[in-house]
């Protein structure tokens, strides 16, 4: 990170990460979870010796006892996350075609509360960019927690508004590195946008000729409204591409929302209706 091999977006998190790595703070690595990498430690039932090993030991190295009990906890999921970029690509087989082609990867997207711990298994930086997003808070700006009872069940939201509405709300309201508030009205607005897009698509499909072939007709067949909407489309596509290249997903989502709703549906489709009739 200090050499610039890995960059953070937003850049201000570079200092946070370096300070965290140099701070040497104590860190509780164990978790009481059903799933995860179980801690590779065994305890001798007779003398209390702790044995750390890659595989289950047969005897205690101190007293020779065969009565060994494994630690029931799992490692913090940060360990799993650190292994993910290469463990999914065939590692530890370093001749894996996927590992050679895809590793190192490009981008890690993570929250600022999940600073990654790069483990030196491969000798290479696992990615060149770390995109930091905020956390989703409740409507009052509080962190969601079991103790406050303010958590949101995404399955209930999806059942009421649809998965696409929840996804779009989370993207549309995001800015790199900043928290956002969960507001149900925004999910409802995203649902309405999805319905608008569905209705626009249905209108187009109902009016397509049976022999329609996708493609742009020659310029002589385009009237002024066609050229206008295509110009707007190219403008928003260019602006969105720039946003996405700079990890500004929220701005990109806002642009597509505005184009579909304000330009395409409210203007172009209404202009096109008399021509189709």
Task: Describe every region a protein language model picked out.
Residues 1-209, 229-272, 276:
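Structured secondary-structure scaffolds
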């Amino acid at each position: 990170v200090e050499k610039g091999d890995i960059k953070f977006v937003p850049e201000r998190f570079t200092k946070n990460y370096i300070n965290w790595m140099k701070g040497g703070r104590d860190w509780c690595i164990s978790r009481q979870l059903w799933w995860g990498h179980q801690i590779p430690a065994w305890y001798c039932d007779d003398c209390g010796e702790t044995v750390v090993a890659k595989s289950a030991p047969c005897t205690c190295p101190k007293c020779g006892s065969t009565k060994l009990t494994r630690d029931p906890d799992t490692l913090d999921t940060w360990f799993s996350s650190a292994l993910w970029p290469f463990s999914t690509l065939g590692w530890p087989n370093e001749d894996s075609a996927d590992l050679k082609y895809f590793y190192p990867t490009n981008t890690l997207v993570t929250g600022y509360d999940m600073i990654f711990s790069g483990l030196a298994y491969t000798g290479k930086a696992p990615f060149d960019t770390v995109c930091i997003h905020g956390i989703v808070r409740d409507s009052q700006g509080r962190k969601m927690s079991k103790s406050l009872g303010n958590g949101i069940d995404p399955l209930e939201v999806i059942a009421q508004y649809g998965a696409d509405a929840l996804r779009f709300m989370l993207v549309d309201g995001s800015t790199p590195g900043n928290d956002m508030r969960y507001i149900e009205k925004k999910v409802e607005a995203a649902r309405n946008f999805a319905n608008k897009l569905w209705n626009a698509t249905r209108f187009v499909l109902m009016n397509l000729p049976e022999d329609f072939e996708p493609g742009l007709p020659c310029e002589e067949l385009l009237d002024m409204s066609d050229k206008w909407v295509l110009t707007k489309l190219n403008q928003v596509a260019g602006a969105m591409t720039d946003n996405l290249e700079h990890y500004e997903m929220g701005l990109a989502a806002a642009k597509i929302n505005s184009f579909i709703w304000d330009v395409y549906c409210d203007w172009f489709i209404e202009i096109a209706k008399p021509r189709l009739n």
